[in-house]
Amino acid sequence: AEHHLAAAVSEAGGLGLIGASAAPAEWVRNEIREAKKLTDKPFGVNIMLMSPYADEVAKVVAEEGVKVVTTGAGNPEKYMELWKNAGIRVIPVVASVALARRMERAGADAVVAEGCESGGHIGETTTMALVPQVADAVKIPVIAAGGIADGRGMAAAFMLGAEAVQMGTRFVASKEAVVHENYKQLVIKAKDIDTRVTGRTTGHP
């Protein structure tokens, strides 16, 4: 999300996240500062570690006083000391029990157990299968993600051992999301069989 949506989620009682994606560090810095103008509540930044700007973005979040960093597409261990010294809570996205355990050993404050229902490149394990196994394997809090769209999904995640949920696609059609109206309408009108999974042939579904 960009700063409008991240701030709106935080204002509504959640923890909004700015998606750094593959954006340059100064773009991320500007997004953080713009979000601070819209909310005085905590928000976080998601850093895609395969980004060519990851090293610079890692420094920016520390400099700007971001409260939470979530990470994906890479190993955040080399940034842990920097972020911990800045008082940042680090929450990596994981798609397996083995990675969850490794992140716990590395000092993660929590993990996002993200199943294949999520709208991103992740493993083949479903959310319902992954979350309880991760919850049993680590002592840090587990956040469930992938296919959760309402209170029923959240309640199910809690029963599986999660302590929170992460949602992304659920907010695509919100007025704060910087997405073309045609795309929003396609999401709203989509039925249960309309999802298409890409990337299987490259090993990144």
PLM features: residue spans?
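Conserved active-site-proximal phosphate/metal-binding subdomains
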Residues: L5, A129-I143, A149-P205
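Active-site entrance/lid segments in N-terminal catalytic domains of soluble metabolic enzymes
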Residues: A1-P141
